Amino acid sequence: YEEGVMADFKLTEEDINFLCSHALVVTGIWGTIESELHRIKERNVPVAFDFADKINHEITHRALPYVDYAFFSCDNKSDKELHKFMISIKSKGPKVVIVTKGEKGSIVYDGNEFTEFGIVECEVIDSMGAGDSYIAGFLMGILEGKPIFECMQKGALSSSETIGYYGAW
């Protein structure tokens, strides 16, 4: 992946102020702001980060200490492998680790327990944007103060709506 014009992108103080005026900052592996996350965390603004499937990427390791909600996509590991991975990620800083598993649903680890949720059955037209929609629904639940299971349910519902039509991205 080549960043193009984003390779030289840097947040200004005005950008940081704008981001921190919101209830939550959401970014991802391609957002190129991982070196600035500490400035957001210093202001006690929660950070959600979409690491996609980049489990061992250098950005992943740099960002984790400043992330509250760490999202990963992984549908090729056993439950035992996922649990081990999620415990390891949680130990690096995030408050909650969320893994979407495609048609196998999702799993969340909050440091105390693993919570699993399946999918919302629907007709799949185009899976593009399913993960982003899950993240949006999950985080909406967080902002509404919902328990983890309900956040997962909101994420799955949002995802099911997105994959029901072509060109969601």
Tell me what each language-model feature is.
Residues 83-169:
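Conserved phosphate-binding/catalytic region of the ribokinase-like
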